[in-house]
Amino acid sequence: MAQPSLRPPTMTDVARRAGVSHQTVSRVLGDHPNVRDDTRAKVLNAIGELGYRRNSSARALVTRRTRTLGVVASNSTLYGPASTLFALEEAARAKGYLVSTVSLRKLTVKTLSEALDRLIEGGVDGLLTVAPQQSAAAALTELSTPFPVVTVGSGSGAGIPGVTVDQHLGARLATGHLLDAGHRRVWHVAGPEDWQEAQDRADGWRAALAAAGIEPPEPPLSGDWSPLSGYRAGQELVVRAGRELTAVFVANDQMALGVLRALREAGLRTPHDVAVVGFDDIPEAEFFAPPLTTVRQDFTAVGRRSITLLLDRIEGRESSPPRIVIEPQLIIRTSTSPSPPP
């Protein structure tokens, strides 16, 4: 007999009582053939003991008719993840789908599993993850889901379909632009070490310098994507580089804003003394003083291609490649110029 409770039992309660995963409960409810008989019996017994009843959303999950897509996102207040989320919602709406988002401060196996529980209970047809940290790939590969999954951005597990902007290429474009302008030493202010995109951009910077036969000034300074961290890195860069400082590639535009202020306070003019290139092309970049040369990411294309890739998986089509890479674009403004004469 069902025990009295202040709330109706959930799929998570059934999984806990039966000693199985929520994915297994979902498969039993959907009469999936790949469930052992003894496991199926344990789940059905738990359902009877708890008095669990599927709601319409959970039932729709099995038939894939909710027309709702789940999104798990971390660091969603930052420009890149926030722009990606907006693009996903726009693209999903254009296809007649709603988006249910779970925002996480940090993505781990535990937090991702809890987010999946919530989305499964609500009923979704598929999942998109916007989690750029390197730990996201490990978390994704350790969990199985009862629906298709697509990663958006650089954090991807092996074998998981996804869409990303070519961060490595973007960094090579930025660094190459400074080298083409005559600079022979290009410094770098990197993003957080645990972000895959920051690592890819730093690797692209190194690759561009190596292709030109130039030793990169190691290690690069780093920040947390904020203008304040860029400002502090800029102050340190002025001291460390001294007269060798003529060009800086900054891993995002907001940190570049801080670097520009640090240079200005040190009496260095941009671009006359030091050229600066950012990354992202945030809406404010063209209004920086001076307007910022930067690398533009096409978040609209990322959203559109991600939704198409996920819907192809949901509907059993394989028309989209498993991994889609979108090329960034160098936007040249007045924060860069040829290297000043010695």
Task: Identify the role of each PLM range.
Residues V239-P342:
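Flexible loop/turn connectors
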Residues G123-A131, R185-A190, P220-L221, A241-N252, ...:
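Periplasmic-binding protein-like
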Residues M1-P9, T68-G176, D180:
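Alpha-helical recognition/docking segments in bacterial nutrient-uptake
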